[in-house]
Amino acid sequence: MIGPTKKPQDFGFKDGDTHLIVNDITEVMTAYDFHGNKRWEIPCLARGQGSDTDWKHPRTDTPPGLYKLGAVYDDYGKVGLHAACDRTHLAYGWCSFDMVSLDHHEEDAGRAGIMMHGGGSGCGWPGAWAPKQHLVPTFGCVRAYNSDLRDKILPLTKKGTVFVSVFQEG
């Protein structure tokens, strides 16, 4: 497994913050609080359009490394369950979060624009807007169920900093 070279503690990890660990092999995201207590696990993908060990090219797997969640886009909060089909809703689902690279693995791989989101154009409409849409590979982002992003990740962003460690096959 290849993962981050730094830890959340290197960036001021404190009480109220959360550490999400994304394992592309097991397709699971696990949340831990500041004290190391496991909060929950949810299904997710960190899978792109290339081979299982490629994250250095556009549209391939999420680059391994340490990120923090940045800007939050709560489309579900704006339009609710019965949204009209549009490209953003189709591709990104209910909620999306910018992922800010902290250990520069994203930049070192020549990548940019990595996010965590739901949706999935491959699910069609209204499938991409379903609470538990089919998890299809992305162009390099972390994808989780729409309902998990709204109910589990979004509240964490209101409590503190959310750090994300992405682990990939080597």
Stretches with model-predicted labels:
Residues M1-K7:
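A general sequence property marking short-to-moderate contiguous segments
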Residues K7-M115, G119:
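Gly/Pro-biased beta-strand-loop elements
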Residues Y76-G170:
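Exported/periplasmic cell-wall-interacting domains
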